[in-house]
């Protein structure tokens, strides 16, 4: 890359010297320094013996002095600006080529924190745009934990009862649907209360389960519509 830049500079320097060049025979010993303007210092003139270095030395001498600008400098300015922009572009590309592998190595070496940062990026953006919503997001796990804790507190007496007296806990489990029914529909709860002795008998003697299941439709019909229940008894007696 450096060789290409140097070659480009040499070509630009030679192209700038073609217009004002003076041809000397190969056997001639005429100093190249005689081509330089007379207002340049003698030290600069003695150094500029190489034709390839003449434009570069001339530019340095003019930049260091306060003399009026020569037409040669105006010819070289666009070329120099082009070279400078090219050099800056090449440097930026080289820097990018050097930095990107380092970033990739860091990301591969520390992938877990990088992925965590990517996961938390929406929350960071949310905290910047809407702090109130971000605070709610932060409090969400605590709200869920509070809900679970309240449920545990409600179930704590039943858990203690199950540990101390399993039979009483079983009765509580049997009566739990009735409690929920009482909260939802009071009329149905009263009906279930009338049927409660049958359920208690079932809890005491599981052998009566089949009889209770067979009689349950008739009992419910008797509680809801006594006239229809009486007709069912008449029809049942006629059949048997």
From Swiss-Prot:
Write the record's keywords in alphabetical order, separated by commas. Answer: Repeat, Seed storage protein, Signal, Storage protein
Q: Which InterPro entries match?
A: Maize_Zein_Storage, Zein
The organism is Zea mays
Q: Which residues form the signal peptide?
A: 1-21
What else the UniProt entry mentions is: The alpha zeins of 19 kDa and 22 kDa account for 70% of the total zein fraction. They are encoded by a large multigene family.
Can you tell me which family this protein belongs to?
A: Belongs to the zein family.
Query: GO molecular function of the protein, one example?
Result: nutrient reservoir activity
Q: What does this protein do?
A: Zeins are major seed storage proteins.
**What is the protein's name according to its record?**
Zein-alpha 19C1
Highest rank taxon of the organism: Eukaryota
């Amino acid at each position: 890359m450096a060789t290409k830049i140097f070659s480009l500079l040499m070509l630009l320097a030679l192209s700038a010297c073609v217009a004002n060049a003076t041809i000397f025979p190969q056997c001639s010993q005429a100093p190249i320094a005689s081509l330089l303007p007379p207002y340049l210092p003698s030290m600069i003139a003695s150094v500029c013996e190489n034709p390839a270095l003449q434009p570069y030395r001339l530019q340095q001498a003019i930049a260091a002095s306060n003399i009026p600008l020569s037409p040669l400098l105006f010819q070289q300015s666009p070329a120099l600006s082009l070279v400078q922009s090219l050099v800056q572009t090449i440097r930026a590309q080289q820097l990018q080529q050097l930095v990107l592998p380092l970033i990739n190595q860091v990301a591969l070496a520390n992938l877990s924190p990088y992925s965590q940062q990517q996961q938390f990026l929406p929350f960071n953006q949310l905290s910047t745009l809407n702090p109130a919503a971000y605070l709610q997001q932060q409090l969400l796990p605590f709200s869920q934990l509070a809900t679970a804790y309240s449920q545990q507190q409600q179930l704590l007496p039943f858990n203690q009862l199950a540990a101390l007296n399993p039979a009483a806990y079983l009765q509580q489990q049997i009566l739990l649907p009735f409690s929920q029914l009482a909260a939802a529909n009071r009329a149905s709860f009263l009906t279930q209360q009338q049927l409660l002795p049958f359920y208690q008998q079932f809890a005491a003697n599981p052998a009566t389960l089949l009889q209770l299941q067979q009689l349950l439709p008739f009992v419910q019909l008797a509680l809801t519509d006594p006239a229809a229940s009486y007709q069912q008894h008449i029809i049942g007696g006629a059949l048997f």
